[in-house]
Amino acid sequence: YPIHYLLKNKPDIIIGIEKYEQAPAANFANLDAQYFYEYARRGFGISPSNMKLLVDEDANLINSLGIISKWLPGKIKKNETELIIFFAGHGLASNDGKELYILMQDSDPDLLSRTALSRTELFKEIISLKPKSVTMFMDTCYSGVSRDEEILLASARPIRIVVDEQEGVPD
């Protein structure tokens, strides 16, 4: 089969947020999402009816939750569907660093648990749909600063990976 035939029915959720209501801009994130959409459509042959593109103002929490909770379940066939998710924008960690959040366009960095998308909850919801596979492109970091070094949240703590010296580095 040609690759277009194999990929055309893959559902894609593509989100890119440059302009935030309450956070500094994530430069070019909206363009990254639009380019990914075009690449998926033209390069992979994925049907626009199987793709949801949310950019800037459209990428608010309500719209994002609607796609994940209403649109996506109708597109997933258990153990058959291969899902693609692309996100470009800001992420933040909770003050204690235990929870990671994806900032939507209207998220308030001071009210993460109420206004941002929990990465853990997103993963749980996707796993509960039982797709065959999930490919995620997450162009976000959880450092608490933008590319221009603007602070997203005064109390934000960066997430760092620390190697346990006793365990060593895996082969």
Model-found features: residue ranges?
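Pro/Ala/Gly-rich low-complexity, hydrophilic intrinsically disordered segments
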Residues: Y1-P11
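Short beta->alpha junction loops
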Residues: M51-L61
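Signal peptide-proximal N-terminal region
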Residues: Y35-N50
